[in-house]
Amino acid sequence: MTISTVIAFMSMFLVFVMSGPIVVEGRAFFVFGDSLVDSGNNNYLVTTARADSPPYGIDFPTRRPTGRFSNGLNIPDLISEAIGNEEPPLPYLSPELRGRSLLNGANFASAGIGILNDTGFQFINIIRMYQQLDYFQQYQQRVSRLIGKPQTQRLVSQALVLITVGGNDFVNNYFLFPYSARSRQFTLPDYVRLLISEYKKILLRLNSLGVGRVLVTGAGPLGCAPAELARSGTSNGRCSAELQRAASLYDPQLLQMINELNKKIGRNVFIAANTNQMQEDFLSTPRRYGFVTSKVACCGQGPYNGMGLCTVLSNLCPNRELYVFWDAFHPTEKANRMIVRHILTGTTKYMNPMNLSSALAL
């Protein structure tokens, strides 16, 4: 053996000893869904559903847009913070998601998507739910090459999963315009049953991929977003009755489906978050929670600042802490913090069968 060969061998040995095996620390966090939880995947796609330009991110720690549909932190960021993770999971399409950063989890969410594949067609290129789940499978293969299959299975089974999807199936599909294809095909109750049936398939596939704890959020107060107030032409700020009816049909059936799945599986894999009720509290009495309005968006134009996109040319409020809505559809960071507080410690009025803190303590 030559001296150069010995030196090369010793160098490789020292690198191995110093670096050691990759150890999984903390709890991985995986995120699936739409713009409420997208942390930047759409930045890497040719799509109109983007939040990568100012003033998005105006209150983010870097003061720069990241692809989050928020003035600052979104719900995955705040949950990551609450469960003690140093960083929120990176977007799956981010080139920075490699090596050890994979062990923190990944965010697969994509703005504009819905439960149904035809939802959000107007946004062109988005990561639909089936593709998000395919990416999750791909993620597990990548991590297996890093830490081995048994460790990967353990990482996934002990991880927390958040899935937020369904609102776009109403706003950007059934009620997108009068006499939409889906509204001609289904009555609203039948359409809700279709969504629940398709959502059940998504959750069953997630379960088959080895996850152990899944937080499922409801539709939220769909008819109260500034975009819907502007669209309905209301002058008194009253929420859209048709969209509120949709949410009132959807959320109880979602909870029933989740309870049935847990019973079938034999343990509480799925946790339902009643985000409609959570937001109803500060939508109906905003001043009680330190807001000046729950109807006008901080950033936008037209009635209620609810028309079009939030851009550098839009009206922009000076203090985001006083607004429930950041743009035409999405809550401010302050509102997100209130939602996450309920998710973590809320009673059965908001969380079923238990809140997230109780679930993670099991």
UniProtKB/Swiss-Prot annotation:
The active site is at S35, D327, H330. Its EC number is 3.1.1.-. Gene3D superfamilies: SGNH hydrolase. One of its GO terms (molecular function) is hydrolase activity, acting on ester bonds. GO terms for biological process: lipid catabolic process. It is an enzyme of class 3 (hydrolase). Transmembrane segments: none annotated. Residues 1-19 form the signal peptide. Keywords: Glycoprotein, Hydrolase, Lipid degradation, Lipid metabolism, Secreted, Signal. Belongs to the 'GDSL' lipolytic enzyme family. GO terms for cellular component: extracellular region. Glycans are attached at N117, N355. It is found in: Secreted. This is GDSL esterase/lipase At5g18430. InterPro entries: GDSL, GDSL_Est/Lipase, SGNH_hydro_sf, SGNH_plant_lipase-like. CDD domains: SGNH_plant_lipase_like. It holds the Pfam family Lipase_GDSL.
